[in-house]
Swiss-Prot record:
ATP binds at residues 41-43, 100-101. This is Ribose-phosphate pyrophosphokinase. The lineage of its organism: Bacteria, Pseudomonadati, Pseudomonadota, Alphaproteobacteria, Hyphomicrobiales. GO terms for cellular component: cytoplasm; ribose phosphate diphosphokinase complex. The gene is prs. Its main location: cytoplasm. The keyword Transmembrane helix does not apply.
Amino acid sequence: MSAKNGSIKLVAGNSNPALAQAIAQGLHLPLTKAVVRRFADMEIFVEIQENVRGSDAFIIQSTSFPANDHLMELLIITDALRRSSARRITAVLPYFGYARQDRKSGSRTPISAKLVANLITQAGVDRVMTLDLHAGQIQGFFDIPTDNLYAAPLMVRDIKDKFDLSKTMVISPDVGGVARARGLAKRINTPLAIVDKRRERPGESEVMNVIGDVAGYTCILVDDIVDSGGTLVNAADALIAKGAKDVYAYITHGVLSGGAAARITNSKLKELVITDSILPTDAVSKAPNIRTLPIASLISDAIARTAAEESVSSLFD
C-alpha cells in the first residue's frame, strides 16, 4: 500500500507490540525496521534502520503504563523520523495517557493533558489519531489535526451478537458518562439508566443511587476507562441490589492497574469487555471474566484513509 504522496511507514514503540503487528497485517505492510531501546542509565535510544525520506510515517504507541517512558519513546521516535526527512508524521495513540488531567482539579494544579499535547506537537508530529478520548474537548488541546476514533461500532456488533436486546439496558456508571451511554443505547435501541454516586456528608462512604428501573434487565455498563475497577464493581453491586438480572461492562481502555483484575474477577460482574488499546498484563489475560475486543482493523482502516487523503469520520456515519 502506498500513500497518496509517498510510501507508508509504520513505526512501533514498545507500548503494545502485538497491536502494532496486527495493524501492520491489516494494512498488508511490514513494520519499519527500528531499534527502540534503553541505555544502561535508562535513557531511550531510537534508530530508524531503513529509508523513510518522503514517507507518510505512522507511529503506533499508546502512552499507557509506564506512561512517562512510553511518552518519551513517542517523542524521540518523532524526532528521529523528522531528522530522517519523513514527509508527514502521524502519532497513532490508541490510548492517550494523561487524558484524565484535562482540567484544573484544584488550586495550583496543572492541565497535564494540554501540556502533553503541546509536547507531542512541538516534537514534530503533524497529525494525531487516537481512540475514545476521555473528553472530546481534548481534541482542541492539539494545534494540529486530530482524529478521535470510536470503539462504539465494535461494541455494538458484539452486543447485538451476544444479548437479547429486548431485555437489555445500557447503564452509565456515573453522571459524567451519560452522553457516552446514551449514544450506545440509541445505537442498539435500549433503555438507559444511571448510577449516581455521592456522599451525603463529609467522611461518609459513597452511596450508589440507581436512577431508573433495572429490575429483570441484563445491564451493560459503558465507560471509556477502567482503572482500579472500584467504581465498576460498586455499580454492579448497586444494580444487582436493585434487581438487575446480570451485569456486564463494555469499557474501551483497560488500564486495570494494581489489583484491578482480581477485583473484577471477584465481583458481581458477569463479564468485562475491553479493547486491546493497552497491552494487557498477565493478571488481566488470565482473568476468567475479562474479554478483549481487537481494534486493529478499525485503526488499519483509519490509517489507510488518512494516507489516501480520504474521510476518516465516514467510518462512523
